[in-house]
A protein has these predicted regions:
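Acidic-glycine-rich active-site phosphate/pyrophosphate-binding loop
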Residues: 93-109, 177, 191-201, 323
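Acidic/His- and Gly-rich active-site-bordering loop/insert found
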Residues: 2-116, 137-140
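Metal-dependent amide/peptide-bond hydrolase catalytic core
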Residues: 1-10, 17, 24, 55, ...
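Glycine/serine-rich anion-binding loops at beta->alpha junctions
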Residues: 112-126, 208
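Phosphate-handling active-site elements
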Residues: 99, 109-111, 131-146, 230-240, ...
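Short glycine-aspartate micro-motif
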Residues: 85-87, 113, 174-178, 197-199, ...
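Acidic/histidine-rich catalytic neighborhood of metal-dependent amide-processing enzymes
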Residues: 121-193, 393-395
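A structural signal for isolated positions on well-ordered beta-strands in alpha/beta enzyme cores
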Residues: 61, 87, 146-148, 298
Length: 395
């Protein structure tokens, strides 16, 4: 374990000397707005990051993913160094449309940062960048350090090849830290649920509700039965392996016409692929049984984010990072499995050591109340500089 007073003092001085620069960079990054569909603004964010990566001596590039999605921005320090890459990853897109900063501008107050995306997950990018900057200034050349951020994590990735590129860059690495925000309770995430979107379509028979009521087959009525039955698939126990939530419904045109069409969309969460198969089988059974004779229901899988499962390599990565944190008096309190899909799943799927929720701590993601704790920003920089110097723990 490399933990010397000399290195500790060097890191402390680096953070103190760069506090103003860190906040300025944080502000600039948050002010680069962009959500799914705002390709021009997201590209500006990617270019901003690429420029800054290059300014600190990283070899950097934008990688096009297609499908109308924003590019991946990546930079590598010490590309020719021996050993495998230590990767800091995540996303630079947010859920907030351009213009949100006018209503909720970046600010720091009472030890917290506020603004669109400060917690999810631009704070994690700031940590990653200043870790790389420190390692460059310290003359660290022991292993390659890669920053790798996608621009479509908060989006439906249909038509793009982001997932294939993540898997490509994840293969053969030393370890990856997904810099999504940490909970304020301090746990590192070692598992996340997968999420799958389904479209349910009911075909009925249109008719006039006054003149031909009995001839009609109300698609909305049939859908109402389907929704209740689909919701009931969710096990009632707390440690359930999957859940079904029908969250969108569309049907009908006017009140004086029995609708022949209704569609709904369901969100399915699951801890492993076996659980998804079990859940999906029950969903198909529900949709194949017509309550109203003469109606037909179709169930179609639309999009999937696979679960981040706790492999042996994930356990090894957690043990190593926890050892570093404990040695330096850090704030990692334990490990946690949580809801909400993430790209750590694709690192894990190719056998990589990977951890999630390694970034800044905060709360109220995806809302105007979102905030991040500044002390965790500096603590994160300190933690991962030490992690880099102790790269052998992750082998």
């Amino acid at each position: 374990m490399i933990f010397t007073k000399e290195l500790e003092e060097k890191i402390r001085k680096y953070i103190d000397d760069n506090r103003e620069l860190i906040i300025d960079f944080y502000r600039d990054l948050v002010n680069h707005e962009g959500k799914d569909g705002e390709i021009d603004n997201l590209r500006k964010t990617a270019s901003f990051l690429k420029k800054n990566f290059e300014l600190i001596g990283m070899s950097s590039e934008l990688i096009e993913v297609g499908g109308g999605h924003a590019p991946i921005v990546t930079g590598v320090l010490n590309p020719k160094a021996p050993g495998k890459e230590m990767v800091f990853t995540g996303h630079y897109d947010t859920v907030f449309p351009t213009g949100t900063k006018g209503k909720n501008p970046f600010k720091t107050e009472n030890g917290k940062a506020f603004g669109p995306g400060v917690c999810d997950m631009k704070g994690g990018i700031v940590i990653s960048f200043f870790v790389a900057k420190a390692l460059k200034e310290f003359g660290f050349k022991t292993c390659p350090i890669r920053l790798f951020f996608v621009g479509d994590e908060e989006a439906n990735r249909e038509g793009g090849n982001t997932i294939e590129l993540i898997k490509k860059y994840a293969s053969g690495i030393l370890v990856a830290f997904n810099m999504e925000n940490r909970n304020e309770s301090g746990e590192i995430c070692i598992a996340r649920q997968g999420v799958c979107e389904y479209k349910i379509t009911v075909k009925g028979v249109a008719a006039h509700p006054g003149k031909a009521f009995d001839e009609g087959r109300n698609a909305i009525e049939e859908m109402s039965h389907k929704i209740i039955a689909l919701q009931a698939i969710t096990p009632k126990r707390k440690n359930r392996q999957y859940s079904v939530s029908v969250d969108v419904i569309k049907g009908g045109i006017v009140t004086n016409a029995i609708p022949d069409h209704c569609e709904a969309y369901a969100d399915v969460r699951f801890w492993n692929m076996q659980a998804l198969e079990e859940c999906e089988s029950k969903m198909f059974k529900v949709c194949s049984d017509a309550i109203l004779e003469g109606t037909e229901t179709e169930l179609k899988r639309m999009d999937i984010l696979i679960p981040f499962e706790t492999t042996e390599n994930v356990r090894k990565a957690y043990k190593a990072l926890k050892e570093v944190s404990d040695a330096i008096g850090g704030t990692i309190t334990g490990s946690v499995a949580t809801g909400g899909a993430c790209d750590a799943a694709y690192f894990s799927s190719v056998g990589a050591k990977v951890l999630c929720q390694c970034g800044i701590t905060g709360a109220y993601n995806h809302s105007i109340r979102e905030y991040a704790r500044l002390d965790s920003l500096y603590e994160g920089i300190r933690l991962f500089i030490f992690a880099a110097y102790n790269f052998k723990l992750f082998e």
